[in-house]
């Protein structure tokens, strides 16, 4: 009888709360908003359940600055704007796998950049960590296939992989980055 009671309680809780994936994919935790959200803020619409159950997102996931490296701050800003409006937007299914965070980083890209931070999803949703990953990825692949040190090359590699600057299918992506105010020489 006790087992049946626990099953009913667990089932009711699962139905009441459903999936918290939108919150957890953004690096947050679903909880009642009467609890303190230390070093962060609450965002509605990412958790299922009652009206007072909201996503606690830490400030570290949503603020900070770009990591320094071979890609200029301006170029990082343009790429970030194209990918997410430069917001920690969580993960979305894109071209056969999830892309996450500020720069819409895929898990393979995160491994190639040295796997910074505590996990792929949390790094992608932290501006400093995500931009560190982009910097490391570019440092690793910029010389591949003769790509030049330019914002155009960085953007096209970000979009198309290590030889992305040589693929014509990344020219459209570069147009979007260029429209954000970056030029070929923005580095």
Curated annotation (Swiss-Prot):
PROSITE patterns: LYSOZYME_I (PS51909). InterPro entries: Invert_lysozyme, Lysozyme-like_dom_sf. One of its GO terms (molecular function) is lysozyme activity. It is found in: Secreted. Disulfide bonds join 75-151, 80-86, 91-100, 113-133, 123-129, 147-165. Highest levels of expression detected in the digestive glands. Lower levels in the mantle, labial palps, gills and style-midgut sac, and lowest levels detected in the hemocytes. Not detected in the gonads. Residues 1-18 form the signal peptide. Belongs to the glycosyl hydrolase 22 family. Type-I lysozyme subfamily. Its EC number is 3.2.1.17. GO terms for cellular component: extracellular region. One of its GO terms (biological process) is defense response to Gram-negative bacterium. Its main location: secreted. Substrate binds at residues 106-112, 137, 158-160. It catalyses: Hydrolysis of (1->4)-beta-linkages between N-acetylmuramic acid and N-acetyl-D-glucosamine residues in a peptidoglycan and between N-acetyl-D-glucosamine residues in chitodextrins. The active site is at residues 83, 94. Has antibacterial activity against the Gram-negative bacterium E.coli. No antibacterial activity detected against the Gram-negative bacterium V.vulnificus. It comes from the Eukaryota. CDD domains: lyz_i. Keywords: Antibiotic, Antimicrobial, Bacteriolytic enzyme, Disulfide bond, Glycosidase, Hydrolase, Secreted, Signal. Optimum pH is 7.5-8.5. This is Lysozyme 3. Residues 68-183 form the I-type lysozyme domain.
